[in-house]
Amino acid sequence: MSSSKTISIIGGGCAGYSLLNKLKNVSNIEIDFFIGKNEGINNFWGYWEYDKDIPDNILSGKWNKWKISTQDGEKFFESSSHPYCVTTRHNWISYCKQNTNKKNIRILKEDIIEINNKIYNKNNDEIISDFIFDSRYKNKSKNIFLQHFKGFLIKTETDCFDD
């Protein structure tokens, strides 16, 4: 019999819930999920599909073709095996909550602070786990690349887009 590992996930946004969703079938783990108190705005969560078990009904869009446009031109891409998917934050978190085994997971609505590379809860108790994953955004480098999309949601009365 193998011993259980402890995992702490910090950050209750889409990235934290994505990790929780990935860990749902792992045995012999105990998870403390620190989601914080901030519910966040209902923005969009985009990802490349690798898991076919995520239902299309939670998606806002799914594309097998896309292009990247820069000042220097455009580059077209296509992937039938790993389409780009977009859902809303609320749909994604709701899906992850419904499809996660709760018996080994503690969801904690408390903020976490970091002092001298150590992580503490609201009672100033140090968070100690075998693995700690912090999905909160930290702007530590000017050279960090963040993927953001600026655009509009367009709805038409007739289907005119080549999904």
Task: For each feature predicted by the language model, list its residue ranges.
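Short glycine-/acidic-enriched loop or helix-start segments at secondary-structure transitions
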Residues: 19-20, 43, 142-144
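A conserved beta-strand/loop capping segment in the N-terminal third of enzymes
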Residues: 49-110, 116-118
